[in-house]
A protein has these predicted regions:
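Glycine-rich anion/phosphate-binding loop at the beta-strand->alpha-helix junction
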Residues: 175, 226, 233-327, 331-332
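Glycine-rich cofactor-pocket loops
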Residues: 140-162, 272-288, 321-328, 353-373
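A helix-coil-helix interface module used to build multimeric assemblies
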Residues: 1-199, 207-220, 281-282, 292-296, ...
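Long, amphipathic alpha-helical stalk/connector segments used for oligomerization, subunit docking
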Residues: 303-389, 395
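Amphipathic alpha-helices that form helix-helix packing interfaces
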Residues: 39-42, 124, 128-131, 135-138, ...
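Short, well-ordered beta-strand elements within core beta-sheets of diverse protein domains
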Residues: 163, 242-250, 377-385
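Short beta-alpha connecting loops at secondary-structure transitions
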Residues: 20-24, 69-71, 279-299, 321-336, ...
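Active/binding-pocket-proximal capping segment
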Residues: 272, 395-402
């Protein structure tokens, strides 16, 4: 840990080493060299005077980057791409004359950005699939556990703990669907020159249009992509960055919603996130068990959601074929968005894997409210016993108000059942009334909906991503 210079908390505290490496300079510069090799191979295969010996020399030094030479050169020329062209040429004297031939800086810069974002999205997908797997297992485990539902954070018709978890799961599934679409449509910039017209290649290939048309598809294939964007200015459209950032923001929104619910449930003592034996909740209040993981999910999620504005504004404000006011913003917003969402997903995995449910507390809260919710059934039973529906409705309203006063003003337990049993209009005993107090009578189809969702919606998706399953997350602090 550095103490004499600023280090982003996203890398020091929150993101995994795997995600951190994807956005490192080392990943970037190694990808530059792969792109230069792909370009040289393509040009050789299409007839330019490039030898196999030159290609082999480039491949021999694809990984052992002479960073010291590149740094010293950049101090002199103030241009990162040309500094690395020079450094590569120092290692490859036979090939130095054909490195970066016909290309502009964006050939390596923008294609690398696409490759890096693609790799980062793959890691996001992997972790997202595992969050969905953990959540669906939790939902299935607690599909029959009745619990109070809340609308406006006021007690409402009961649901189950598992059914509530399906709501969180479904939001992450929508994110996965969006992510898969964007991943499936990622394309490279290709090599189109300074303004996207491929003018330099017209010169190199003596105006042979048919040959030039083969350049981008060949580069894409060599770099593991299906195709390149058909048209561009100097850069790929910054709309691509916007789409990627929106995917991250969507996942962040889903995580934030889940974390909020967990925080509220922890306040009610119905559900708790994992709490380690040596963990300290408060420096002053030693008894505290704060939901700090869920709070951190919410905190980082807000950052990612707001960060999505950066690529959108950058895309909107680009001039003509390109302006450089995208560069500094991209260097911050895209990598940090990925670091933050990586930390969020690790936290989600950790929290969901260790969620603790307290059925007795849930039952206590349920039974405090269930008499109110059972009044319609009670009224129907009383009508069947000979009562008048309208009169009974009015009596239930009056008795409910009286019971509510007992709970809120006097701080006593809900005595609605006792009040109804004592009212001759209902002709029902307390024993009869208590028979209607089984919470499972009031959860509707929550269990069946959960089973169907897990079996028919989630499991087929997990089965199609089996190779991604099995991730366990560790959090640093």
């Amino acid at each position: 840990m550095s103490t004499d210079r600023y280090v982003s908390p996203l890398s020091e505290r929150y993101a995994s080493k795997e995600m951190q490496y994807i956005i490192t300079p080392d990943m970037k510069f190694r990808t530059w060299r792969k792109l230069w090799i792909a370009l040289a191979e393509t040009e050789k295969e299409l007839g330019l005077n490039i030898t196999q010996e030159q290609i082999d020399e480039l491949k021999a030094h694809a990984e052992d980057i002479n960073y010291d030479v590149a740094r010293e050169r950049e101090r002199q020329v103030r241009h990162d791409v040309m500094s690395h062209v020079y450094a590569y040429g120092v290692q490859c004297p036979k090939a130095k004359g054909i490195i970066h031939l016909g290309a502009t800086s964006c050939y390596v810069g923008d294609n690398t950005d696409i490759i890096v974002m693609t790799e980062a999205l793959k890691l996001v997908r992997k972790k997202l699939v595992n969050v969905i797997a953990e959540l669906s297992a939790f939902a299935d485990k607690y599909k029959e556990q009745p619990t109070l539902a809340f609308t406006h954070f006021q007690p409402a018709q009961p649901t189950t703990v598992g059914k509530r978890a399906t709501l969180w799961t479904q939001e992450f599934l929508l994110d996965l669907e969006d992510l898969e679409y964007v991943l499936g449509t990622m394309k490279l910039l290709g090599s189109k020159g300074t303004t996207g017209t491929q003018a330099s290649f017209l010169e190199l290939f003596d105006g042979d249009q048919e040959t030039i048309d083969k350049i981008d598809p060949m580069i894409a294939k060599k770099m593991g992509f299906k195709e390149c964007y058909p048209v561009s200015g100097q850069t790929y459209s910054r709309k691509v960055d916007t789409r990627v950032a929106n995917i991250l923001a969507g996942i962040a929104a889903s995580a934030h919603k889940m974390s909020n619910d967990i925080r509220l449930l922890q306040h009610l003592k119905e559900v708790e996130e994992p709490f380690e034996k040596s963990q300290i909740g408060s420096s002053a209040m030693a008894y505290k068990r704060n939901p700090m993981r869920s709070e951190r999910i919410a905190s980082l999620s807000r950052y990612v959601m707001v960060d999505a504005l950066n690529p959108a504004i950058t895309s909107a404000t680009q001039w003509f074929e390109r302006t450089l006011d995208d560069s500094a913003n991209k260097r911050l917003s895209i990598p940090e968005g990925f670091l933050a969402i990586d930390g969020i997903l690790d936290l989600c995995l950790n929290v969901v894997d260790g969620l603790v449910v307290y059925p007795k507390v849930i039952e206590k809260h349920m039974m405090a409210e269930l008499p109110f919710m059972a009044t319609e059934n009670i009224m129907m039973d009383a009508v069947k016993a000979g009562g008048d529906r309208q009169e009974l409705h009015e009596r239930i309203r009056e008795l409910s108000m009286e019971a509510g006063k007992t709970v809120k003003v006097e701080g006593k337990d809900n005595n609605l059942l006792e009040l109804i049993a004592a009212d001759p209009a209902f002709n029902l005993s307390l024993e009869d009334l208590q028979k209607s107090m089984d919470p499972k009578k009031y959860i509707g189809r929550a269990k069946e909906q959960t089973e169907r969702f897990v079996n028919e919606v989630v499991r087929p998706i997990l089965n199609s991503h089996k190779e991604l399953l099995g991730v366990k997350a560790e959090i640093n602090v």
